Amino acid sequence: ELRKLEEKSDLLEQVRILLQNTSEYAREQARQQIEILVTHALEYVFGLDIQFKIELKEVRGRTEADFFVKSTYGDYIVETRPQDARGGGIVDVISLALRIAMLQAFQPKIMGPLILDEPAKHVSEEYIGGVAQFLKYYCDMFSRQDIMITHNHQLSEVADKVFLIELKQGKSIVTPYTSA
């Protein structure tokens, strides 16, 4: 009887170790894929001197993630939290790329469009064109429709269709928009 309990205990311990190793492997794969996608987004918008890093750590038996932006300035490498790196535009681009990464990584796949409301409101004029091209590239790459609400003309210029919505006498009037 005791021997059977010991064997069962050993088996359960082996199963626990297997599940733990599998979980660690899956977390590492997800971390790498997300880092790559977000880094590509940052490079697309801000240039090749920037990377996105995720640091995973165990805290009270739970895995937590910290995000960092790693920038290269000549021989100097600076690693900061996104909210501390070069302003709010970085946070907007990271947020956008993380949403896309989560949509693509989730199983079963989440179908339907990517719906965005002013996705790059803190990105400066200098970089907004890069955000527009990034969105176009990734929506084309993942065959995902993008429905976006924006006041930014550069973002709307990469759209296949643009609609102007105006409030007139308490009613929303929707008309196809063509640039002049």
Residue ranges and their predicted role:
Residues R60-A65:
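A short, glycine/Asx- and small/polar-enriched loop/turn
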